[in-house]
């Protein structure tokens, strides 16, 4: 399961960011169809750099980095 801060690869073929890697900004637990918000480095034609995806449209590439202990 993806979590905030994970690096994910996009598997949705009609997406501008298909096969690109982005960072998970948030995951909604309320039961909506596209609960995962992913932020990308590059922008699409409209100047947008985030999009919502379903969990089955994502593959986790890298787990989030652990926060350093104080």
Swiss-Prot record:
Keywords: Membrane, Photosynthesis, Photosystem I, Thylakoid. GO terms for biological process: photosynthesis. It is found in: Cellular thylakoid membrane. One of its GO terms (cellular component) is plasma membrane-derived thylakoid membrane. It holds the Pfam family PSI_PsaE. Gene3D superfamilies: 2.30.30.50. It is a peripheral membrane protein. It comes from the Bacteria. Stabilizes the interaction between PsaC and the PSI core, assists the docking of the ferredoxin to PSI and interacts with ferredoxin-NADP oxidoreductase. Belongs to the PsaE family. This is Photosystem I reaction center subunit IV. It comes from Nostoc sp. (strain PCC 8009).
């Amino acid at each position: 399961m993806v979590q905030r801060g994970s690096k994910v690869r996009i598997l949705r073929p009609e997406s501008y960011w298909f096969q690109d890697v982005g960072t998970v900004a948030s995951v909604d637990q309320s039961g909506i169809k596209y609960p995962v918000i992913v932020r990308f480095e590059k922008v699409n034609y409209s100047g947008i750099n985030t999009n919502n995806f379903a969990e089955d449209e994502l593959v986790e590439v890298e787990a989030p980095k652990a926060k350093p202990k104080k």
